[in-house]
Amino acid sequence: VQEPSEPDCMLGIGKGYQGKKATTVTGTRCQAWAAQEPHRHSIFTPEANPWANLEKNYCRNPDGDVNGPWCYTMNPQKLFDYCDVPQCESSPFDCGKPKVEPKKCSGRIVGGCVAIAHSWPWQISLRTRFGRHFCGGTLISPEWVLTAAHCLERSSRPSTYKVVLGTHHELRLAAGAQQIDVSKLFLEPSRADIALLKLSSPAIITQNVIPACLPPADYVVANWAECFVTGWGETQDSSNAGVLKEAQLPVIENKVCNRYEYLNGRVKSTELCAGHLVGGVDSCQGDSGGPLVCFEKDKYILQGVTSWGLGCARPNKPGVYVRVSSFINWIERIMQSN
């Protein structure tokens, strides 16, 4: 499969820049990273930095220099110089339409399967300031993420959190991954388990970063609709830990879910249930706040925010999700006034 050519541009300071620019701002040719002529150097060699993709003589930013990508130069009088790499522009987008077709495995996330990289491009990783992943979330516009309120219990200060977009691996971030600080957070006023995060700068919309669609207000998902939950959460098979997983889950109508043998009246009208009544599949911790999306006509619509479940993938105990359609008026009001 031919990768669509990435535009030759950088995000932020270009730490993840993987383009082919090979001249400095003054037009001087770059020295190959593996070469020792005209300049001898030992720190930024491909051997010393296998993860930095120091290939040929392309500009790179292996040390996270605030001035952006650079290279050693072919001018014997000048050791290194910066390169003129433009910032990436956002692409126009249709919400809920991935550029990479999802696998849609009917496996069971404790069951689930590993997702195809970037096939759920609205999935975000909510992290501590130090980069530790602890919850999921969903990009719903370039500047806004929806997550679970209980994910924000550790602190009410936005500076405590950051959002990672466009990554498949929890630890090894993809080249085009974006890390953006949170500038504001809003908890739903009636204490529902849902919250909005405003990003400090808009996400750049790329083929790996695309918002999900929101449902119409008060929309009720059809029983047994084709819905998927995604996340990096705990799985029984820990060999796949750290990569994004998906599971297809049927939605179960509230009156069935609230029967005595299932969740026995605990599910509110502003919540929805999804899961296999025989158990075995479910989203689990670490996927709190993440998306439950349902495919309709030609796009994925965010219908649920992962909230709670009794145990993990136990028979007769489906997972419970906040019903996004119950909060559309609140979501739109906050987004418009901030």
From Swiss-Prot:
Domain Peptidase S1 span(s) in chain numbering: 109-336
Active-site residues annotated for this sequence: 150, 193, 288
Kringle domain location: 9-88
Reactions accelerated catalytically: Preferential cleavage: Lys-|-Xaa > Arg-|-Xaa, higher selectivity than trypsin. Converts fibrin into soluble products
Regulation (activators, inhibitors): Converted into plasmin by plasminogen activators, both plasminogen and its activator being bound to fibrin. Activated with catalytic amounts of streptokinase.
Principal location listed in the UniProt entry: secreted
Catalytic activity, EC: 3.4.21.7
InterPro entries: Kringle, Kringle-like, Kringle_CS, Kringle_sf, Peptidase_S1_PA, Peptidase_S1_PA_chymotrypsin, Peptidase_S1A, Serine_Proteases_S1
PTM sites of type Phosphoserine: 125
Keywords, in A-Z order: Blood coagulation, Disulfide bond, Fibrinolysis, Hemostasis, Hydrolase, Kringle, Phosphoprotein, Protease, Secreted, Serine protease, Tissue remodeling, Zymogen
Swiss-Prot/TrEMBL site (Interaction with streptokinase) positions: 157, 191, 269
Family: Belongs to the peptidase S1 family. Plasminogen subfamily.
This protein's name: Plasminogen
Organism of derivation: Equus caballus
